[in-house]
Amino acid sequence: MCVRVPATSANLGPGFDCLGVALDLANEFEFCEADRFRCVVHSTVSPEDARQVATDERNLAWRAFTHLFEHLGKTPPTVALTVMMHVPLGRGLGSSATAIVGGIAAANRWLGSPLSTPEWLLLASRLEGHPDNVVPAALGGCQLSILGETLLTCALDWHPQIALVLAVPDFALATSKARAALPKTVPHTDAVFNAVHLALLVRALATGDARWLAEALQDRLHQPYRTGLIPGWQDVRAAALEAGAWGVVISGAGPSVLALTHLDCAEAVRQAMASTWPNACLYCPGLDPNGCRVEVEAG
């Protein structure tokens, strides 16, 4: 059984912990029945990334796999797990969500799909702690989600002329460190600011309206507290805006940076960001419309 789960970029500015988009870059998790647990990790990103992933029973995909079995009161099988990593670790691209979704989706299919997609997605979101990466990783596209006693998800329209430019720097930022930078409370005016801008962003993404997007991508809940953790943020943001980007946001907890621009400007924005961050990898990723895919080998 092989599970392919896309990378994600969460928040998109004002959508803190509730908004995310699936990208056309994915990790793959292969589960095969075996006589003893084994885990092998390969990375096309870097050998260092592969070394950072646990290959014992602490492996996150394996823990997610067994979590669903235990949730249903079942004994998990012994498997050989192979992980093929294409999503870099610690860059704000939802690598942990790929493991959680991959493990839970595989376990559900292994058992004959006893849980509906909303049911196992709730389990995955609770395991992750927030749904902004997990939901688009599972469902694809751009997703708005709310996690409470239940999980509510809403697929958002994405105008075809909106392009993404992603800058992935050559340094990592631990999500725990990025979370620790956030205050426990924020001014009421900042909360109102984000509520208004998130509402506008939903319409702006659907219409592709340039003025709306330029306004809507602003944030006061998390980015002002995290930009100091990303060396070069101000310069790469300024370069992207100068080249025609509507807005520039931190991808997830960072340190990757995501620019939104018109399709016709994407290459100019990519080159401008690359000239400012010469050691970063620059992409113009498309959206993954499908999300998690499970393939079961016949026989």
From Swiss-Prot:
User: Could you confirm whether the keyword Cytoplasm appears in this record?
Assistant: yes
User: Coiled-coil ranges per the record?
Assistant: none
Annotated SUPFAM superfamilies: GHMP Kinase, C-terminal domain, Ribosomal protein S5 domain 2-like
- Keyword field: Amino-acid biosynthesis, ATP-binding, Cytoplasm, Kinase, Nucleotide-binding, Threonine biosynthesis, Transferase
Specify the enzyme's EC class, one word: transferase
Q: Which reaction does it catalyse?
A: L-homoserine + ATP = O-phospho-L-homoserine + ADP + H(+)
Q: Tell me, which GO biological process terms does this entry list?
A: threonine biosynthetic process
EC assignment? 2.7.1.39
Looking at the keywords, is Transit peptide present? no
Q: Where does ATP bind?
A: P88, L89, G90, R91, G92, L93, G94, S95, S96, A97, T98
Q: Which Pfam families match?
A: GHMP_kinases_C, GHMP_kinases_N
PROSITE patterns membership: GHMP_KINASES_ATP
Q: Which residues cross the membrane?
A: none
Q: Which subcellular locations apply to this protein?
A: Cytoplasm
InterPro entries, sorted: GHMP_kinase_C_dom, GHMP_kinase_C_sf, GHMP_kinase_N_dom, GHMP_knse_ATP-bd_CS, Homoserine_kinase, Ribosomal_Su5_D2-typ_SF, Ribsml_uS5_D2-typ_fold_subgr
Q: Which GO terms describe its molecular function?
A: ATP binding; homoserine kinase activity
Annotated Gene Ontology cellular components are:
cytoplasm
Superkingdom: Bacteria
Pathway recorded for this protein: Amino-acid biosynthesis; L-threonine biosynthesis; L-threonine from L-aspartate: step 4/5
Indicate the family of this protein.
Answer: Belongs to the GHMP kinase family. Homoserine kinase subfamily.
Q: What does this protein do?
A: Catalyzes the ATP-dependent phosphorylation of L-homoserine to L-homoserine phosphate.
The record ties this protein, via PANTHER family, to: HOMOSERINE KINASE, HOMOSERINE/4-DIPHOSPHOCYTIDYL-2-C-METHYL-D-ERYTHRITOL KINASE
Instruction: Fetch the HAMAP family from UniProt.
Output: Homoser_kinase (MF_00384)
Question: What is the protein named?
Answer: Homoserine kinase
**Species name for this entry?**
Gloeobacter violaceus (strain ATCC 29082 / PCC 7421)
